[in-house]
Amino acid sequence: LFRSGEAGQDTPLAAAASVSAPIDLAATCRNLMRPCNWLSHFMLLRQMKREALGPGAALTPAERDGIRKARTLWQFDEQFTAPRNGFADVADYYARCSAMEFLGGIRIPTLVVAAQDDPWVPCAAYLGQHWSAYESLCLLPLLPEQGGHVGFHGVGSRHPWSDRAVAGFLAFHR
């Protein structure tokens, strides 16, 4: 959504789809850090630290130290991601890189799927959008009450409902 909104008409894509995308990075980070998400938060942070510190990583000693000391995703982004990528701070990074700021720039048919019961990505950012106000009229939001985070398990099918919805949408817009 971020890249599509940023690109506008300058895209080779005929259509796009998004499932459970974190369109508000700050809210998603806060949600992931809730006690009920501690295991997912821990695993995601560990993976991010492992990748950032991996072989061949060109890091300064201060960056390595910041990554190692980060105990939350917020701290990781505050101590490493934001400064490494030229942002003033973590709030600046989250604000400027959140996809909800770019939705109005999307100029291709785009399916947006997000469950209202997603434990990681808060649906409030989706529900707070004025979808009909977007000039492009290219955005189709599907915001079911249930589905979890990329769950959308379909009854009677081994393929998740969201996969079938995305495939149908993209096939229609070929």
What are these language model-derived features?
Residues 141, 147-161:
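Catalytic histidine-centered segment of alpha/beta-hydrolase-like enzymes
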Residues 2-84:
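Alpha/beta-hydrolase-fold enzymes
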Residues 10-11, 103-107, 130-136:
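Short, conserved loop/helix-junction motifs that constitute active-site signature segments
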Residues 165-173:
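C-terminal alpha-helix
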Residues 106, 112-114, 118:
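Short beta-strand/loop motif that positions the catalytic acidic residue
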Residues 79-102:
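Active-site nucleophile elbow and catalytic-triad environment of alpha/beta-hydrolase enzymes
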Residues 100, 116-119, 146-148:
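Acidic beta-to-alpha connecting loop that harbors the catalytic carboxylate
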Residues 116, 120-140:
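Conserved loop-alpha-helix segment in the C-terminal half of the alpha/beta-hydrolase fold
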